[in-house]
Amino acid sequence: MTDFLNKLLSWYQSNARDFPFRQTTDPYLIWLSEVIMQQTRIEQGVPYYNSFVKVFPTVHDLAGASEEEVLKQWQGLGYYTRARNLHATANEIVEKYGGRFPENYENLRELKGVGDYTAAAIASVCFGQPHPVMDGNVIRFITRHFGITDAVDLAAAKKEIMEVLDELMENVQVLWEVSSATELLRPTIGLLPKSGKPLTSSLPRLTLTEASPSGDPAAVPDATEPSHNPFHPGLFNQAMIEFGATYCVPRNPNCRECIFNESCYALKYGMVDKLPLKKQQQALKSRYFHYLVISVRGKKGIYFRKRTENDIWKGLYEFPLIETSKPVTLPRLLNSIEWKQHFGKTPLKILSQTGSASHLLSHQKISATFYRLEIEKPSDKFGSLIHPKNIHELPVARIIEKYLETHQTSEL
């Protein structure tokens, strides 16, 4: 295990990508980065992270925001339950802990929306606690290298993966404590970054002297470990994720030049393209949305309604909607009970129909058709009539955002 760790952490120091959240151990910033990066590829998530930190630089700012403001900043990331949990957790941290994050894994795990992965990331990076993280990148790396051939979405395989990670983390903890106590483990030529790349640009700062973004020095966790010590639990976790994300990739990894090619089970037995093994994926559920883009003759704006039911996109705004169990033509839609419930004898004019647009979620496929309609008089039953200049302030799902991008709000 020591040889594995030496190779991994040496590789990380020389190859880690430089991201803003790798330059801090502030638990608020680490928490934000972990939640956001779970939604998207890290390169795509960095702009969201930067924007979020700019608008909500401290946990107090996030807690004091409205849910709509949070959802608007989250727009485009999907899975909006996480954004709502983020907001709720910020309020919990402010109200219950005075704005300071709990400093142990168990209390972090009790926070709303904070699972094993996020709690382990905060505990290890910010507080040096030996809790391994397990995401898709880590699972892929571990199953290939150590030869775990059970389906990874089953409990038995997850337990086996965590046992390997726990053993690795135990070794990290021992090496960290020894090196911190004796100061014998210093960077060697093999541990130094590539030429021209400063060490601090690729590793989290483990010794902080500045105040946190909130301006409160007390909010910065104590970190007395020397920044050059590679055997830090947080660095181990980040190295595992980084290697899986950039080297032990899902398809066509460069095994010939991999630093673990002599010890990798999957490479030895020709299973690189087969691991990690997964059981049959759940079939996608198809849903058919018919959006009614309603305006009022002689008035600027279109109607929006807020989704309040316990379904996808809760808390976001959308056009009035009719959902059907299968694709339907416009004549059939006009004769449906749902259409009559919406409009009854309300005079209206159908201006246009936009062809079906698709949007994939984790277990659902949304097929949406948009109908531009004009009614004679305003009606509260369709929601709120939003002026074009204010539409951009509403948090909306990506499928609505795409429609608005295609059809300029000034024309609506």
State what each model feature region is.
Residues 4-7, 11-202, 211-253, 263, ...:
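Catalytic cores of DNA base-excision repair glycosylases
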Residues 1-17, 23, 174-180, 188-204, ...:
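Intrinsically disordered, low-complexity, charged terminal extensions of DNA damage-control enzymes
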Residues 206-208:
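Ser/Thr/Pro-rich, intrinsically disordered low-complexity segments
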